[in-house]
Amino acid sequence: MRQLLLLPIRFYQYAISPMMASHCRHYPTCSQYAVEAIQHHGPLKGGYLATARLLRCHPWAEGGYDPVPGTELNTAPRSGQACNPTESTHSTTQTRH
């Protein structure tokens, strides 16, 4: 079922998209988002996420980084969240000479 859903998306990516002048305002592109959503979440939820993404993609959309929920890149720690305060190399106490 997944491969059947991915077939028209792959056709679009390799046969149609390269001939189009416009580019997706999101990263990953809407077609790549659909592939990742279907592969990660399955046909039903992935198809729903892909459809919701396509509805968010329009000329007035802000665009930018919009990963598939639950993917590795989306769950990676943000800057500063992986630091343990006890592992700091800077001392907070001052020594007097």
Swiss-Prot record:
CC terms in the record's Gene Ontology section: plasma membrane
Compositionally biased tracts (Polar residues): 72-97
Keywords for the protein's UniProt record, in alphabetical order: Cell inner membrane, Cell membrane, Membrane
Main location as per UniProt: membrane
Region Disordered, annotated ranges: 68-97
Compartments reported by the entry: Cell inner membrane
InterPro entries: Membr_insert_effic_factor_YidD (IPR002696)
Membrane topology (UniProt): Peripheral membrane protein
Highest taxon listed in the record's lineage: Bacteria
Pfam families xrefs: YidD
Homology family: Belongs to the UPF0161 family.
HAMAP family, sorted: UPF0161_YidD (MF_00386)
Role this protein plays: Could be involved in insertion of integral membrane proteins into the membrane.
Protein name per its UniProtKB record: Putative membrane protein insertion efficiency factor
Species of provenance: Marinobacter nauticus (strain ATCC 700491 / DSM 11845 / VT8) (Marinobacter aquaeolei)
